[in-house]
């Protein structure tokens, strides 16, 4: 079963080396099962079949040629293209003609592939509409049907309709969808909520986890595990009963905890890290260590400037994408340099809070079904995780949660991810009060709360504010009795989004909120995106609670 495992170590004598090559690193457990960890695309009868391989694996040197030549400004465009004929025939044709003197790569691609459509570009908003009316009219624009794709593309089939974020993101995304669902519920779109509930349950049943998104190149990783929060929303909104999802929650939990039983202290496998005291915490991970299909050229360039083995950098870039915070100072050794990324060496506060929620949800639903042993087991797991988080990720001196660098055995940076323990009910009241003071003094602006207090040029840092962080902060602080702060964040965010909407007549992915003048957020690997799923969802929910700004 084991390819490599440390024999009879004494944890007290182990000194952690930060930058050992992964293949030789004794603190990274290697199990044979990891080779088979990535699932294959599933077919659904009556729907177009996806390609069995990712675009990079399918088109090989053609893929690298297209990406290196920068035929498209966005590296995601080619992976999202659909072939006009059998993909293998396209590759054979390319190999026959690529060395011809008059070979034109751009024309070859245009002749053999359908370019992805950007549906939202067809939509023109009515300036007379209120913010609420605008959002309600956007839902159909952002809805995709199961049959809305061409055979052999990278798009994974789903059994029901789904919402996409918009812009370059023409597929559904895991954690985005939860925040989008908040708005669907407020808009009375229970039909779409049911469809999305069925889709996510189907993905867990067929893939063993919910992929980052429904693309073949996303199958090797997930995103922040918010399915337990979705189930809670389905129950509250009367869409689906929570009991029907107990097995799905257990399956997702097994995915995140895979290999835990084989670990010794100071050792990790996939998503799990066993801490020096034997407790278990989690990290973000991707089962591949190659450049991301959708950001291939950017990843290759980043690795060139890292001074590390490229596959190590690719893994950390992929894990950063799995975090949803792609990218942020949270994952960087040098906050000004993406090439210093070390995502897999950090224990994230938000991930472990979401997993606490997952453990608690399994316990609660097991109790409803009379499964007392399962309830007791998962209550114990949730309690153990909370204790470990308090031991390693709570900064008592400053009254904040922080990520933890498990390779250097020290606390990492403070960010708005620290509010997730409040949102899932993991903090005590003293922690909530102290964290509120820190957020007020370090992250709060007239436009909402910043992603972090560090200005790095990455999109999940200052000066940007993001809808999901506002929602979790608002609800988290109110849950612990700080209505004043929760309401202030809510009204500030509504003002930000509405002011921008009145000027530009659109909703966007992120907002620059550092100086009190709302404008387009920047940073990251791609241009700012319109749409935008989770902004619409959070704002629509807030309008239901606070009225139109």
Curated annotation (Swiss-Prot):
Locations listed in the record: Cytoplasm
SUPFAM superfamilies according to UniProt: Six-hairpin glycosidases
PROSITE patterns, per database record: TREHALASE_1, TREHALASE_2
Pfam families: Trehalase (PF01204)
Catalytic activity: alpha,alpha-trehalose + H2O = alpha-D-glucose + beta-D-glucose
Annotated keywords: Cytoplasm, Glycosidase, Hydrolase
UniProt key word Kinase: no
A Gene Ontology cellular-component term: cytoplasm
Broad class of the protein's primary localization: cytoplasm
Cross-referenced InterPro entries: 6-hairpin_glycosidase_sf, 6hp_glycosidase-like_sf, Cyt_trehalase, Glyco_hydro_37, Glyco_hydro_37_CS
Transmembrane segments: none
Catalytic residues, chain numbering: 326 (proton donor/acceptor), 509 (proton donor/acceptor)
E.C. numbers: 3.2.1.28
Pathway(s) per entry: Glycan degradation; trehalose degradation; D-glucose from alpha,alpha-trehalose: step 1/1
Residues that, per the record, bind substrate: 168, 175-176, 212, 221-223, 292-294, 324, 525
GO molecular function, one term: alpha,alpha-trehalase activity
One annotated GO biological process: trehalose catabolic process
Keyword Hydrolase included in the entry's annotation: yes
PANTHER family: CYTOPLASMIC TREHALASE, TREHALASE
The family this protein is said to belong to: Belongs to the glycosyl hydrolase 37 family.
Quaternary state and interactors: Monomer.
Record's function text: Hydrolyzes trehalose to glucose. Could be involved, in cells returning to low osmolarity conditions, in the utilization of the accumulated cytoplasmic trehalose, which was synthesized in response to high osmolarity.
Protein name according to UniProt: Cytoplasmic trehalase
Organism: Escherichia coli O139:H28 (strain E24377A / ETEC)
């Amino acid at each position: 079963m084991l390819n490599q495992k440390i024999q009879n170590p004494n944890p007290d004598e182990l000194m952690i080396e930060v930058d050992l090559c992964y293949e030789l690193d004794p603190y990274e457990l290697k199990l044979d099962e990891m080779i088979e960890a990535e699932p294959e695309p599933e077919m659904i009868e009556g729907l177009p079949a996806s390609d069995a391989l990712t675009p990079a694996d399918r088109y090989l040197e053609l893929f690298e040629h297209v990406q290196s030549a920068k035929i498209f400004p966005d590296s995601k465009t080619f992976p999202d293209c659909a072939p006009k004929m059998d993909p293998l025939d396209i590759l054979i044709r390319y190999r026959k003609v690529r060395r011809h003197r008059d070979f034109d790569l751009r024309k070859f691609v245009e002749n053999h592939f359908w370019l992805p459509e950007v549906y939202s570009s067809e939509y023109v908003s009515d300036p007379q509409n209120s913010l609420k009316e605008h959002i309600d009219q956007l839902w159909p624009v952002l809805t995709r049907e199961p049959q809305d794709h061409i055979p052999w593309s990278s798009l994974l089939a789903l059994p029901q309709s789904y919402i996409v974020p918009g812009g370059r993101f023409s597929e559904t995304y895991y954690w985005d969808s939860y925040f989008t669902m908040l708005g669907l519920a407020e808009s009375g779109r229970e039909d779409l909520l049911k469809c999305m509930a069925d889709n996510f349950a189907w993905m867990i049943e067929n893939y063993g986890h919910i992929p980052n998104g429904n693309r073949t190149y996303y199958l090797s990783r997930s995103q922040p595990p918010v399915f337990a929060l979705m189930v809670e929303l389905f129950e509250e909104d009367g869409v689906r009963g929570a009991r029907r999802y107990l097995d799905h929650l257990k399956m997702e939990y097994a995915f995140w905890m895979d290999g835990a039983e084989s670990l010794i202290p100071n050792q990790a496998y996939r998503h799990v890290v066993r801490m020096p005291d034997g407790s278990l915490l989690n990290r973000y991970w991707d089962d591949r260590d190659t450049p991301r299909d959708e950001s291939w050229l950017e990843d290759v360039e980043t690795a060139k400037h890292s001074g590390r083995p490229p596959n190590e950098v690719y893994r950390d870039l992929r894990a950063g994408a799995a975090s949803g915070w792609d990218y942020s100072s949270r994952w960087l050794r040098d906050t000004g340099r993406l090439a210093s990324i070390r995502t897999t060496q950090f224990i994230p506060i938000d991930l472990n809070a979401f997993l606490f929620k997952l453990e608690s949800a399994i316990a609660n639903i097991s109790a409803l079904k009379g499964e007392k042993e399962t309830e007791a087991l998962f209550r114990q797991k949730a309690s153990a995780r909370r204790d470990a988080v308090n031991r390693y990720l709570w900064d008592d001196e400053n009254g904040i949660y922080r990520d933890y660098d498990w390779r250097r055995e020290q606390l990492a940076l403070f960010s708005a991810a620290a509010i997730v323990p409040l949102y899932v009910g993991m903090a005590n009241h003293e922690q909530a009060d102290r964290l509120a003071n820190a957020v007020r003094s370090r992250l709060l602006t007239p436009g909402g709360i910043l992603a972090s207090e560090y200005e790095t040029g990455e999109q999940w840092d200052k000066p940007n504010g993001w809808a999901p962080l506002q929602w979790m902060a608002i609800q988290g602080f109110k849950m612990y009795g700080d209505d004043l702060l929760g309401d202030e964040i809510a009204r500030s965010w509504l003002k930000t989004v509405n002011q921008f909407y009145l000027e530009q007549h659109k909703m966007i992915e992120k907002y620059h909120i550092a100086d009190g003048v709302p404008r387009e957020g920047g940073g990251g690997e791609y241009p700012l995106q319109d749409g935008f799923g989770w902004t619409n969802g959070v704002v629509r929910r807030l309008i239901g609670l606070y009225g139109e700004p």
